[in-house]
Amino acid sequence: MAFTWIRHHILGLEDWQPEEYQTLLQTASSFREVLSRRTKKVPALQGQVVTNLFFEPSTRTRSSFELAAKRLSADVLNFAPGSSSLTKGETILDTALTYVAMGTDIFVIRHQQSGVPDLIAGEMDRLESGVSILNAGDGQHEHPSQGLLDLFTICCLLDEENPRLELLEGKKIAIVGDILHSRVARSNIWSLTTAGAEVHLSAPPTLLPKYFGELCDRLFLHWDLEPALEKADFVMTLRLQKERMTANLLPSLREYHQSFGITRPRLQSCQPGVKVLHPGPVNRGVEISSDLMDDPDFSLISQQVTSGVAVRMALLYLIGNLRSDQ
């Protein structure tokens, strides 16, 4: 029986079912083919309005969502908080309602506080506006589109023609870095463990609290790097989010790199053909060495950026198409 997409908002991946991941992978694969054409545009969301509400700085995610919406022929509005009525005391909800009155169909929302996309989604549902919310990263909660594009990147490497969830069954994936503050880590934990992968988290104790081990099955914690990397199929390294650190959680960036930085020699204990991912932006020479980051034999960072457009097209299409059917 064919799976029917019914999810109106994309707020996080914690409750996603395997069928939803598979539908997303198949849809993103179709749009990846579209993006390989000379004419990279389709009329799937023609006449719909996508509004990017980004309350904290972003280059990759905002640009990727904007390009994805435009490739689907949607009209795109970009919100700039510094020049908005928020500086005059307007609330976030009132700002959103202003854009609803302009005809917004889908909000893409990033905010430094966890839960803001959920709050706006709840208000949209209460008002029966029909507007969908897509979380582009909220505080330390989740970053679902990043988790999905990482999943898609890995699956495409394993089978470019037919990326599917089952390809990750039994794979070992190490996630190294600032786990404590990372919404990317949380979304990847949900997606990768649902796919059947073993996820090994590694960081200094100050950046990897013990409670992470209670999130789900197939999740392992390491306060040393070596056991996390041993026989790993993929290594995902995360940026140290210094802007979110309110205490001295690390002696120095140099000492962090010496203990947890991903370098070519450290990958020798991984599986042959190991690949490295990073959600960006990258602190070269801190989370990962420059030579490794730029080596196409190891690094999937460029592929992650490319995959991001196809995955975000798929997300916008799935919720936008659901809206058009209502």
Swiss-Prot record:
GO terms for biological process: 'de novo' pyrimidine nucleobase biosynthetic process; 'de novo' UMP biosynthetic process; amino acid metabolic process. It is an enzyme of class 2 (transferase). PROSITE patterns: CARBAMOYLTRANSFERASE (PS00097). L-aspartate binds at residues 88, 183, 239. One of its GO terms (cellular component) is cytosol. The keyword Transferase applies. Pathway: Pyrimidine metabolism; UMP biosynthesis via de novo pathway; (S)-dihydroorotate from bicarbonate: step 2/3. It catalyses: carbamoyl phosphate + L-aspartate = N-carbamoyl-L-aspartate + phosphate + H(+). GO terms for molecular function: amino acid binding; aspartate carbamoyltransferase activity. Carbamoyl phosphate binds at residues 60-61, 110, 143, 146, 280-281. It holds the Pfam family OTCace. Its EC number is 2.1.3.2. Keywords: Pyrimidine biosynthesis, Transferase. Transmembrane segments: none annotated. Heterododecamer (2C3:3R2) of six catalytic PyrB chains organized as two trimers (C3), and six regulatory PyrI chains organized as three dimers (R2). Catalyzes the condensation of carbamoyl phosphate and aspartate to form carbamoyl aspartate and inorganic phosphate, the committed step in the de novo pyrimidine nucleotide biosynthesis pathway. Belongs to the aspartate/ornithine carbamoyltransferase superfamily. ATCase family. This is Aspartate carbamoyltransferase catalytic subunit. The lineage of its organism: Bacteria, Bacillati, Cyanobacteriota, Cyanophyceae, Oscillatoriophycideae.
